[in-house]
Amino acid sequence: MSKANQKIRIRLKGYDHKAVDQSAEKIVATAKKSGAEVSGPIPLPTEKQIITILRAVHKYKDAREQFEMRTHKRLIDILSPTPKTVDLLMRLDLPAGVDIEIKL
C-alpha cells in the first residue's frame, strides 16, 4: 500500500442532522485514534425538496399544504490511512439513518 497518494473520502448523508454529525464525530475520532490525518467534517450544502399537495379534492384549489425534506451532507477526508485505520472503520457501528459512501 503506497502512502504517497492514498486518501479515503467519506460522504455522509441523512435526514437528521444530529445523527449525521454524531456519525462524523465517531469517524473522525476513530481515524485520529489509529494515527491517520483527518480533514473534516466539512458541511456540504443541504438539499431541500419541497412537495406541494392539495388539501381538498374538488374545487378548493387554493387550499394547499407543503412538506419539505432536507438532506444533510458531510465530507470527511482521511489522509495517509494506515491498515489499522481501515480495519477500525470497517468495525465502526453507525446509526441506521445515515448513508455512507466511501471512496479510496
From Swiss-Prot:
PROSITE patterns: RIBOSOMAL_S10 (PS00361)
Assigned GO CC terms: ribonucleoprotein complex; ribosome
Family to which this protein belongs: Belongs to the universal ribosomal protein uS10 family.
The keyword Ribonucleoprotein is assigned to this record: yes
Keyword line: Ribonucleoprotein, Ribosomal protein
Assembly notes: Part of the 30S ribosomal subunit.
GO BP term, example: translation
GO molecular function, one term: structural constituent of ribosome
Gene3D superfamilies per UniProt: Ribosomal protein S10 domain (3.30.70.600)
Statement: the UniProt record of this protein carries the keyword Oxidoreductase: no
InterPro entries linked: Ribosomal_uS10, Ribosomal_uS10_CS, Ribosomal_uS10_dom, Ribosomal_uS10_dom_sf
Domain of life of the native organism: Bacteria
HAMAP family reported for this sequence: Ribosomal_uS10
Entry protein name: Small ribosomal subunit protein uS10
Entry function: Involved in the binding of tRNA to the ribosomes.
Originating species: Alkaliphilus metalliredigens (strain QYMF)
